[in-house]
């Protein structure tokens, strides 16, 4: 059994998780990363995706995040999400609204850089939609 460490998942609305866990898989901007106890210190941005938490009791919890930052130190990990919700509580209409807004942002972009950023975000959202919502 892996050693436990402190993990917190915080959104502007509330503290979703604050407990001892064995591991956390984070959708980092540069790719998924697994955090375990005594991880090297790092701060990274997170992209829209699913955070998978393996609890110290052996259970698994999944949360959808819509961007933010992860602060990882040897003693723990704090994920500050722009928005977060348990996968089981995902609102299909809210996700559809976010996708529509991203499409509009891409269409209304003033330059190539803004368009590219909006299209990347749209791609992340549609990938997320396919990963968590049944057809």
Swiss-Prot record:
Classification via CDD domains: F1-ATPase_delta
Protein family per UniProt: Belongs to the ATPase epsilon chain family.
Protein name: ATP synthase epsilon chain
An MF annotation (GO) of this entry: proton-transporting ATP synthase activity, rotational mechanism
Topology with respect to the bilayer: Peripheral membrane protein
Localization per Swiss-Prot or TrEMBL: Cell inner membrane
InterPro entries reported for this sequence: ATP_synth_F1_dsu/esu, ATP_synth_F1_dsu/esu_N, ATPsynth_dsu/esu_N
Physiological role: Produces ATP from ADP in the presence of a proton gradient across the membrane.
Main location as per UniProt: membrane
Keyword vocabulary terms for this entry: ATP synthesis, Cell inner membrane, Cell membrane, CF(1), Hydrogen ion transport, Ion transport, Membrane, Transport
Subunit structure: F-type ATPases have 2 components, CF(1) - the catalytic core - and CF(0) - the membrane proton channel. CF(1) has five subunits: alpha(3), beta(3), gamma(1), delta(1), epsilon(1). CF(0) has three main subunits: a, b and c.
Pfam families: ATP-synt_DE_N (PF02823)
Coiled-coil blocks: none
PANTHER family documented for this protein: ATP SYNTHASE DELTA/EPSILON CHAIN, ATP SYNTHASE EPSILON CHAIN, CHLOROPLASTIC
Gene Ontology CC terms: plasma membrane; proton-transporting ATP synthase complex
HAMAP family in the record: ATP_synth_epsil_bac
